[in-house]
Amino acid sequence: MSAQKPGLHPRNRHHSRYDLATLCQVNPELRQFLTLTPAGEQSVDFANPLAVKALNKALLTHFYAVANWDIPDGFLCPPVPGRADYIHYLADLLAEATGSIPANASILDIGVGANCIYPLIGVHEYGWRFTGSETSSQALSSAQAIISANPGLNRAIRLRRQKESGAIFNGIIHKNEQYDATLCNPPFHDSAAAARAGSERKRRNLGLNKDDALNFGGQQQELWCEGGEVAFIKKMIEESKGFAKQVMWFTSLVSRGENLPPLYRALTDVGAVKVVKKEMAQGQKQSRFIAWTFMNDEQRRRFVNRQR
């Protein structure tokens, strides 16, 4: 039986329920994590992070031609459909300049993570080129291992270590480089304690106890920073002004709608020419990203056409 997942982007490959029989053929490890819902339907044991990792491996192989994917224990295991939505809505944003999605776009992923998820999807779906930045050497090593293990990705994805504490674009965007867009899934919490509380809520919601040796948290740089999401994105906005002619669109996920007003004020303060909000929905979960540019319509058209 097939059922639509409400709200996913029209080009998202995950509108239907997971075809678990096919996914288990792609990744036989997934079989051991299958379970039955109260309605008697086959599902995956989403309370088990090993099950989620096995599902991700199958999805990335089946839909995105990523045959070899893994992440170290303790790192976030991203839900693939939601990550794909960001990429597709970003493609729509880039298409506004000329009426078509640029096939050779250059994208900067701030905080590429151990999973390297956004570049993997963006390269397969649109043939884009990615630069991924990361503060964690362990996450960088994991992402590089994924790239090296899959033919063709070395030509499409490059990684850079952010060595400057607190910096986002500084030290990553080199002189004379140009990017069609940046993307980011920023740290959400404002302290380690808040991050631990969030992980504990997730464990409770999944019916787990503290004795379950399962990690739903992620690493510090994935989950929290001083001042939380708003402070991180405001820092990004401040730095973006210095790269106004090198980047067409700066974008970032924003987890809560109530975080938008201070970000809009910050964008006014730096003189952003245009600000866009893209709403997204994955099932019951609502999300969004904001995008801002320092280029007018004609400048953006010229920017996209520069490499045609």
Curated annotation (Swiss-Prot):
Keyword annotations from UniProtKB, A to Z: Cytoplasm, Methyltransferase, rRNA processing, S-adenosyl-L-methionine, Transferase
Stored InterPro entries: METTL16/RlmF, rRNA_lsu_MeTfrase_F, SAM-dependent_MTases_sf
Enzyme Commission code(s) on record: 2.1.1.181
GO biological process terms, semicolon-separated: rRNA base methylation
Principal EC category: transferase
Main localization category: cytoplasm
Record Pfam families: Methyltransf_10
GO molecular function: 23S rRNA (adenine(1618)-N(6))-methyltransferase activity
Subcellular location per the Swiss-Prot or TrEMBL entry: Cytoplasm
Family membership noted in the UniProt record: Belongs to the methyltransferase superfamily. METTL16/RlmF family.
PANTHER family documented for this protein: RNA N6-ADENOSINE-METHYLTRANSFERASE METTL16, SAM-DEPENDENT METHYLTRANSFERASE
HAMAP family per UniProt: 23SrRNA_methyltr_F (MF_01848)
Functional summary from the UniProt entry: Specifically methylates the adenine in position 1618 of 23S rRNA.
Name recorded for this polypeptide: Ribosomal RNA large subunit methyltransferase F
Species this chain originates from: Escherichia coli O7:K1 (strain IAI39 / ExPEC)
